[in-house]
Every structure is written in C-alpha cells, then in structure tokens.
C-alpha cells in the first residue's frame, strides 16, 4: 500500500532532508537535491535535526509496538493453554512477566548484586564500579549512591529491620552503612586476605558473616566491628554465604564444587554437599512454604517418604540448579535448562516457584512441584548476575553485566 504525503508534508520532508545533508557535510548531494526539489537556499531553524528526531521516534514507537505485541502473544498463549489468567491466579501463583516495568541505568560497570529493602520501596545495587546505588522500585527513580569502597562491591545485605546495610568488596573490606538517616559508612572491618565475595546478617542483627577468596568465612560483631570467629574448610574461593532464617545454621558455596552447612555458634561444618561438577556460584534457603512442593517433587524420584528439610537451592557453573535436604545431606532433584552459568537464585515467597538468573542472559521461573521451567524471560543484553524476589510485594529485580537493574512485575 503506497503512502501518499500531502503537499505540505512533502515540503517539510524535503526541508528536513536538506537540513540533514547540510549538517552532515554532504555539500554536493545537497546542491543537487535543492535543485531537483526546487528548495530555497535559506534553511529554516525549525527543520534543524528534524529528520533524526523523526527517525529515533519511529524506532522508539517500533520498540513499544514490539513490547505490546509480546504482551498480547503471551496473553493469547495463556488463554489457549488454559493457564490461569490474571483474574484466576492467586498472588501465590503470580510470576514475573515481560516486559520489565523499569530498566534503571546509572552504574558504570557490571552489576554484581541486587536486593530489595525489607520494608521500604527501595532496591540496592552493588557494582564493579565500586559504588552502591539506591533506587525507588515503585517509580524507577535513582535515589542516591554510597561511596567508600575502592574496588568492585561484590555483595550487599540488610539486617532484618533494614536499618543497617552491609557491603563487601574486592578491596578486602566489609562496610556497615547507616540506612536510617545519614547513609554514611559507620564501620569498616578488615581481616580477610583476599577479595571478599559475600556478606550476610544473622537474623538477630548482632553479627555479620563474610565469605572470601581467601577460602575462609568470618563472623563479625556489629557493635564493635571485631572478628569473633573464622570458619575454615573450603579448599577454594568461597563464593556466597547465606544464613537460614532461624539463624542456627548457615550455608556457603565455593569454587571447590561443594556447599557446606555450618553451625553458627560453633566452628563446625554440619554437612558437606557434593554433586555439582563445577564452581557453585549461588545458594538460597527455601521458605517453609516450599516444603510441600519440594516433597512432592522429590517423591517422584525416591520413595523415602517425607523430607523434613531445611531445604537449600544451589546454582552452578555446570548450568544446573540442585535442591538439597540439608538435614540428610541429600540432593533431592536437579533442574536443567540454563545454557550457561547459574548466577542467582530466589524463592517465590509462597514457595511454589524458584527464579534463577544466568549468564545465558535469561531469568527462568521453575515450577518446583513439576521440576520444570515454566517461563523464560529474555531479561538482559548481557550476563544476568543477580536476582531477588520481594517478600511482600509482587516484584522481582535483576542485575546484569549490561549495567542495568530491571524491575519485573509479577502477575
């Protein structure tokens, strides 16, 4: 179908083309075009940069159309497949869906970790640019930056009330930040001999645990900043530390392909979990609500009856996710589907689903009961490094090597 321009539109287009040719140094072409199009040599200011503006707005509109088409296709697919539509789904069944609600830019290097504030509508991101940034996930607005580290910030964690933020860095330090009023660094702890890769508060908030490339895990007293315990046992770089909600145990994972579960109060390793064939990048404790789905999934593989848990998920460079019963040191089942390293894990608060982030640039939503990937989100332009699920609101956030933080609405 041929599009017909009005006389006025044709004149404006000719003027815009003439302006483009002139401002980009195509003098000969401009002269020939002016002659053929019968244009005066007087360029009007209003046509300055008009062609570029129209061109970029067309691209922007095309992108919007593609997003809307993707949404429509997804909605149609759900209706055809008989999946519960939004009206029929309960909040416990809501999962992140494309496109993203916000894409937040500002970091000047890869994003290493993204987390939600436990109470306020805020997101915190850590980056290889040595800064920590705070964002409002309800508006997509940037709030502020926390500066103090001198090398890549590897992990961030809140205490239960969200009053203190802990961060750790390749500069060998752990920092505590006042998140109530001043947003200043209130303590810096030194003691590790290499890159500090992960940090976590114990639930009571009086101690912080840190994991390092020096193969150790250390416990620090928040009030004094002193190191009170060192846990040794991993044979290589300790990648992540995560404390169980009850606080009596915590888990670590490492480049030595293992996961260790430790007793917080002693220095003893309770159990070592071995089944991964490569570095274990990330771990996540399952909420109590996930027990029935995990038991049902495990029952299909082994008839050993009811598993008590606690349950832990682990993601590895071997591209798999494993679900473990920590009480017996047993891998209950494996989730396969990612095409590259698994970098981040987060359980749905209602316990039915697990979301994962990977270097294959996707976020995957796993139906635990059926042990299958039920949705794949093509989330980022580069490796997807971190993911978090809000405990009370229907949002997921992801961070990437593409330097963006994305907010995904669950529905």
UniProtKB/Swiss-Prot annotation:
- Is Ribonucleoprotein one of the keywords UniProt gives this record? no
Q: Name one GO molecular function term.
A: dynein complex binding
- List where the protein spans the membrane: none
The record's Gene Ontology cellular component field reads:
axon cytoplasm; cell cortex; dendrite; dynactin complex; dynein complex; growth cone; kinetochore; kinetochore microtubule
Domain LisH per the UniProt entry, residue ranges: 9-41
Q: Which SUPFAM superfamilies match?
A: Lissencephaly-1 protein (Lis-1, PAF-AH alpha) N-terminal domain, WD40 repeat-like
Stored SMART domains: LisH (SM00667), WD40 (SM00320)
One of the Pfam families matching this protein, by short name = LisH_PAC1
**Keyword check for Hydrolase:** no
Q: Which residues form a coiled coil?
A: 56-83
Q: Where in the cell is it found?
A: Cytoplasm, Cytoskeleton; Cytoplasm, Cytoskeleton, Microtubule organizing center, Centrosome
Give the record's keywords alphabetically: Cell cycle, Cell division, Coiled coil, Cytoplasm, Cytoskeleton, Microtubule, Mitosis, Repeat, Transport, WD repeat
One biological process term from GO is: regulation of dendrite morphogenesis
The record's listing under PANTHER family reads: WD REPEAT-CONTAINING PROTEIN POP1 (PTHR44129)
Job description of the protein: Positively regulates the activity of the minus-end directed microtubule motor protein dynein. May enhance dynein-mediated microtubule sliding by targeting dynein to the microtubule plus end. Required for several dynein- and microtubule-dependent processes.
Know anything about its domains from the record?
A: Dimerization mediated by the LisH domain may be required to activate dynein.
Q: What is this protein called?
A: Lissencephaly-1 homolog
Q: Which gene encodes it?
A: Lis-1
């Amino acid at each position: 179908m041929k599009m017909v321009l009005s006389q006025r539109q044709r004149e404006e287009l000719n003027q815009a083309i003439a302006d483009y040719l002139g401002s980009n140094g195509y003098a000969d072409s401009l002269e020939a075009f002016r002659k053929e199009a019968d244009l005066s040599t007087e360029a009007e200011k209003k046509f300055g940069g008009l062609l570029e503006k129209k061109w970029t707005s067309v691209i922007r509109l095309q992108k919007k159309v593609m997003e809307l088409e993707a949404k429509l296709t997804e909605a149609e697919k759900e209706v055809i497949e008989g999946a519960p539509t939004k009206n029929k789904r309960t909040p416990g069944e809501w999962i992140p869906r494309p496109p993203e609600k916000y894409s937040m830019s500002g970091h000047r290097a890869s994003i290493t970790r993204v987390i939600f504030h436990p109470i306020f509508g805020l997101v915190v991101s850590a980056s290889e640019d040595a800064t920590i940034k705070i964002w409002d996930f309800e508006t997509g607005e940037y709030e502020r930056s926390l500066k103090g580290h001198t090398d890549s910030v590897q992990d961030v964690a809140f205490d239960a009330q969200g009053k203190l933020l802990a961060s750790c860095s390749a500069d060998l330090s752990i920092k505590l930040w006042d998140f109530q009023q001043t947003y200043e660094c209130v303590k810096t702890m030194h003691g590790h001999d290499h890159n500090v890769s992960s940090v976590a508060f114990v639930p009571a908030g009086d101690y912080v645990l840190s994991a390092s490339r020096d193969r150790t895990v250390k416990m620090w007293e928040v009030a004094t900043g002193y190191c009170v315990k060192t846990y040794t046992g991993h044979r290589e770089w300790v990648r992540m530390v995560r404390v169980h909600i009850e606080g009596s145990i915590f888990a670590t994972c490492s480049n030595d392909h293992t996961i260790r579960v430790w007793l917080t109060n002693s220095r003893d390793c309770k159990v070592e979990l071995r089944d991964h064939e490569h570095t274990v990048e990330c771990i996540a404790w399952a909420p109590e609500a996930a027990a029935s789905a995990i038991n049902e999934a495990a029952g299909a593989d082994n008839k050993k009856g009811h598993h008590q848990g606690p349950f832990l998920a682990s993601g590895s460079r071997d591209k798999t996710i494993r679900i473990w019963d920590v009480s017996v040191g047993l891998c209950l089942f494996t989730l396969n589907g990612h095409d590259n390293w698994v970098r981040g894990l987060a359980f749905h608060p209602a316990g039915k689903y697990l979301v994962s982030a990977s270097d294959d640039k996707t976020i995957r939503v796993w139906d635990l009961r059926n042990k299958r990937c039920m949705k794949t989100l093509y989330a980022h332009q580069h490796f997807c490094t971190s993911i978090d699920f809000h405990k009370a609101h229907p949002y997921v956030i992801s961070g990437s090597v593409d330097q963006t933080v994305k907010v995904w609405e669950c529905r």
